Amino acid sequence: MGDIEKGKKIFVQKCSQCHTVEKGGKHKTGPNLNGLFGRKTGQAEGFSYTDANKNKGITWGEDTLMEYLENPKKYIPGTKMIFAGIKKKSERADLIAYLKDATSK
């Protein structure tokens, strides 16, 4: 898969203003991502999701994140996430490798 260290840099630059990853981390504009892998969309406790996100019904994993992170609004029309996406597959792979590591601690 990707490079965790490169993924961490991408997370800090593109994601950390809205998301946290650590266990017990606060929700910001976006939900805390701890425990993301294996969780269904719209399920982080205490975060107010759109119906579109709650009703998508997919389980987050490498494949679903690879598609979602390319174009979030295309993957979940109606999501609140204002991020345009990451076009480079290698950058998405790095970010996913980091998220897989950082959200499981």
UniProtKB/Swiss-Prot annotation:
One Pfam family hit: Cytochrom_C
Function: Electron carrier protein. The oxidized form of the cytochrome c heme group can accept an electron from the heme group of the cytochrome c1 subunit of cytochrome reductase. Cytochrome c then transfers this electron to the cytochrome oxidase complex, the final protein carrier in the mitochondrial electron-transport chain.
Name the UniProt record assigns to this protein: Cytochrome c
Annotated GO MF terms: electron transfer activity; heme binding; metal ion binding
SUPFAM superfamilies: Cytochrome c
Keyword Iron part of the UniProt annotation: yes
Binding-site residues for heme c, renumbered to this chain: 15, 18-19, 81
Any one GO cellular component localisation term in the record: mitochondrial intermembrane space
Species this chain originates from: Dromaius novaehollandiae
Database matches in PANTHER family: CYTOCHROME C
Post-translational events: Binds 1 heme c group covalently per subunit.
Family assignment from sequence similarity: Belongs to the cytochrome c family.
Gene that this sequence comes from: CYC
Keywords annotated in UniProt: Acetylation, Electron transport, Heme, Iron, Metal-binding, Mitochondrion, Respiratory chain, Transport
Modified residues (N-acetylglycine): 2
Classification via InterPro entries: Cyt_c-like_dom (IPR009056), Cyt_c-like_dom_sf (IPR036909), Cyt_c_1A/1B (IPR002327)
Subcellular location: Mitochondrion intermembrane space
